[in-house]
């Protein structure tokens, strides 16, 4: 929607400069004729008039500017490089920089600055364009009405593209006031002067249509701003105005679909998208927007939120295909390799959304469980969005998932006999059980190549996590993030992690600072701390996998020191710290971390009151989209988390040869969960304890049954002589050949 403005902007530039510098009557006449020829599309005649003006006044740089604009429009806006070069030369000629604008004397150069801002906008240099636009806005009073509106619309577009919705809303209020005042002034003039003039009435009708179009555009911008702020109540009111002014046009239906997506009405959002008539859209060559690409992308976002990840990736691939087809058509028009911005309309410089779509695909593939494919998408996206710490975290998550190496049963937490018995060697009396090694740490992930090479290895994950930490601001406080859900932008939605969908829903009207994280939403204060917690947790895990125990302990300690920490990450922080301490032979410190009382909550997020969007239900979508991953990554309850702590605590006691305490921890944990949920590591721990106690036959029985035996007793329990003694009668079932147990 933003890129349909270049033609209007160019015409305004020409009008404002063409009539402002006339001195003689001849120059005024030539200037008027040039402007009329320009507005009617007769660029050859316009250039002839400008050439005559140039002969009369060779020192006026504004004539050169108008000539450059006219030639640009004559080429159907395909000579962006030439226009850009001319503007730079003119800026050097007048020795003026936008930073030096400090008074009304410099206002006459405003057209030059505005043209530069338009080009910067189309080259995606938004920060520089905003700098120029804001300087122009300071001196907007003397500008003629049409040019002032063009400056404001450009700034609004830039604010929305850079997620500064509050600034955009303020400027839109100014625009509304400006348009209504201008309309009242025109009505007054028409009543006094042109009541009987047929041309005057036609002009009035045309200006009325332009005003209605401007109002419709303002309403659409307001909806986009409210969508960014997740202010669903305000958005609901404004959507009605959009539908009244724009009808069932594709942009209005896309906006309403995005609104329903945020409310969680996914089926309605899909229905609205399907009802849009894409065929009526002018096409990307005129607007710079590939509506088909946006359509498939937004469908992918919606299906991601519905946890239909395979359908989501299907739609994202369709969007990528559409985008590639459009880019192929655009590149066919470029003939001069030295002028990469020429050979196609300037508005199409914003058409390519490949990297945003790759980002979406990567997040979706990560949820499907295809980390290597996700890595390939995200590693390409990070070359463009290298300043996004959240993207570096996602890359690290791809590396971790690709190197996890767990079977489906282990992922579900079920004991597998493969995880206990590796093989049986020998025959007869000499047969032996070879227990599987549970040590997956310190694996050599690197096969000799540099860890800086982008491969889905744990070494590269460590680099990604370092980058992510370095990109976070030093002084920031307050968490809120985690999984990778997505956020669709009304006409070209980018998917992203659920932290942005969820936490941006908090009203941040207090102007809290945020850092950009393109192509997704910016990271605000709450999200930044939560992102930091996730990065520290992943860093500790990766350091343990690489055998860097001191670094792992450092990351785990930093994680536990965070002021707002989710229960799940606090649980992981204690586990990682304990594992690092055990590897450093600091068992006593590790036991402190393994206290089950440390676990009081295993929720993925932090309880907060930030969901203040009233009765609208839009925020549910972030949790719905991430719900399927949670059970795989975290214990499902506090009870199961405490059993994990007890199993690990038992292992720590074994290392200190406190076998009675270890046995007590083991069976306390086993009593808290279903026998089938006991992990293979706990069964091996029970085998080890029985061997240390001299109960070889009981150890063999545990291995054969592949579960902890309920009647395992300590010496103090044996004296009680209970009626229930199932272990001894079962012993004859054992194969007598299993006499020796050894660890490979």
UniProtKB/Swiss-Prot annotation:
Q: Residue ranges under compositional bias (Basic and acidic residues)?
A: 1-16
Q: Where in the cell is it found?
A: Cytoplasm; Nucleus
Where are the membrane-spanning stretches?
none
What's a GO biological-process term for it?
mRNA catabolic process
Q: Where is the composition biased (Polar residues)?
A: 484-495, 602-612
- N-acetylalanine is found on 2
Q: Where is the composition biased (Low complexity)?
A: 183-199, 496-506
Taking the first listed entry, what is the main subcellular location of this protein, grouped into a coarse class? cytoplasm
Could you list the residue ranges forming a coiled coil in this record?
74-107
Highest taxon listed in the record's lineage = Eukaryota
List UniProt keywords, sorted A-Z: Acetylation, Coiled coil, Cytoplasm, Nucleus, RNA-mediated gene silencing, Transcription, Transcription regulation, Translation regulation
Query: What GO cellular-component annotations does this UniProt entry give?
Result: CCR4-NOT complex; cytoplasm; nucleus
Q: How does it assemble?
A: Component of the CCR4-NOT complex; distinct complexes seem to exist that differ in the participation of probably mutually exclusive catalytic subunits. CNOT10 and CNOT11 form a subcomplex docked to the CNOT1 scaffold.
This protein is called CCR4-NOT transcription complex subunit 10
In which organism is this protein found? Macaca fascicularis (Crab-eating macaque)
């Amino acid at each position: 929607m933003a890129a349909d403005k270049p033609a209007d902007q160019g015409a305004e530039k020409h009008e404002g400069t063409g009539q402002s510098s006339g001195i003689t009557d001849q120059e005024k006449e030539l200037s008027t004729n040039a402007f009329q020829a320009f507005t009617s599309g007769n660029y050859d005649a316009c250039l002839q008039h400008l050439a005559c003006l140039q002969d009369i006044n060779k020192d006026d740089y504004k004539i050169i500017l108008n000539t450059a604009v006219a030639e640009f429009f004559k080429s159907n806006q395909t000579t962006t490089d030439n226009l850009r070069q001319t503007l730079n030369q003119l800026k050097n000629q007048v020795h003026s920089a936008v930073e030096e604008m400090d008074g009304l004397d410099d206002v006459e150069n405003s057209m030059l600055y505005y043209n530069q801002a338009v080009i910067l906008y189309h080259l995606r240099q938004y920060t520089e364009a905003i700098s120029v636009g804001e300087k122009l806005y300071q001196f907007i009073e003397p500008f003629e009405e049409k040019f002032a509106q063009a400056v404001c619309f450009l700034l609004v577009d830039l604010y929305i593209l850079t997620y500064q919705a509050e600034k955009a809303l303020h400027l839109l209020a100014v625009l509304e006031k400006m348009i209504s005042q201008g309309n009242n002034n025109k009505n007054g003039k028409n009543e006094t002067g042109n009541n009987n003039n047929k041309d005057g009435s036609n002009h009035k009708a045309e200006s009325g249509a332009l005003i209605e179009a401007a109002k419709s555009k303002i309403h659409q911008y307001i909806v986009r701003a409210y969508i960014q702020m997740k202010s669903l109540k305000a958005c609901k009111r404004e959507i009605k105005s959009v539908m009244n002014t724009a009808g069932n046009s594709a942009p209005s239906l896309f906006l309403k679909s995005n609104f329903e997506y945020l409310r969680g009405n996914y089926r309605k959002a899909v229905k609205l998208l399907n009802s849009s008539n894409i065929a009526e859209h002018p096409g990307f060559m005129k607007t710079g927007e590939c509506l088909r690409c946006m359509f498939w992308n937004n469908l992918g976002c919606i299906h991601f939120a519905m946890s239909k990840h395979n359908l989501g990736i299907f739609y994202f691939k369709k969007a990528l295909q559409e985008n590639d087809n459009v880019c192929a058509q655009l590149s066919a028009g470029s003939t001069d390799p030295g002028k990469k911005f020429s050979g196609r309309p300037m508005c199409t410089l914003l058409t390519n959304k490949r990297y945003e779509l790759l980002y979406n695909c990567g997040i979706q593939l990560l949820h499907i469980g295809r980390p290597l494919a996700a890595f390939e998408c995200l590693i390409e996206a990070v070359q463009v969005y290298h300043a996004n710490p959240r993207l570096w975290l996602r890359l690290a998550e791809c590396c971790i998932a690709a190197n996890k190496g767990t079977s489906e049963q282990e992922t579900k937490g079920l004991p597998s006999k493969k995880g206990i018995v590796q093989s049986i060697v020998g025959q007869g009396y000499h047969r032996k059980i070879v227990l599987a090694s549970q040590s997956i740490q310190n694996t050599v992930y690197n096969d000799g190549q540099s860890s800086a090479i982008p491969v889905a290895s744990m070494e590269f994950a460590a680099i990604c996590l370092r980058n992510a930490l370095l990109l976070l601001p030093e002084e920031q406080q307050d968490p809120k993030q985690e999984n990778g859900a997505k956020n669709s932008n009304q006409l070209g939605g980018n998917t992203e992690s659920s932290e942005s969908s969820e936490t941006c829903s908090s009203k941040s009207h207090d102007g809290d600072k945020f850092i950009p994280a393109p192509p997704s939403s910016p990271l605000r204060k709450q999200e930044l701390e939560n992102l930091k917690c996730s990065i520290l947790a992943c860093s500790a895990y990766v350091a343990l996998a690489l055998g860097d125990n001191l670094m792992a302990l450092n990351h785990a300690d930093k994680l536990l020191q965070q002021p707002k920490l989710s229960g799940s990450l606090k649980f992981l922080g204690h586990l990682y710290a304990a594992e690092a301490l055990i590897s450093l032979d600091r068992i006593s410190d590790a036991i402190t971390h393994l206290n089950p009382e440390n676990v009081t909550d295993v929720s993925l997020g932090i309880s907060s009151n930030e969901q203040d969007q009233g009765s609208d239900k839009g925020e549910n979508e972030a949790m719905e989209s991430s719900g399927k991953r949670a059970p795989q990554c975290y214990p499902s309850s506090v009870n199961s988390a405490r059993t994990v702590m007890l199993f690990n605590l038992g292992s720590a006691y074994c290392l200190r040869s406190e076998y009675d305490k270890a046995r007590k921890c083991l069976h306390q944990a086993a009593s808290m969960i279903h026998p089938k949920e006991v992990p293979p590591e706990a069964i091996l721990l029970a085998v080890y304890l029985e061997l240390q106690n001299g109960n070889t036959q009981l150890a063999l029985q545990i291995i054969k049954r592949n579960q902890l035996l309920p009647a395992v007793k300590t010496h103090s329990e044996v004296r009680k002589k209970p009626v229930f003694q199932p272990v001894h009668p079962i012993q004859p079932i054992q194969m007598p050949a299993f006499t020796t147990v050894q660890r490979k």
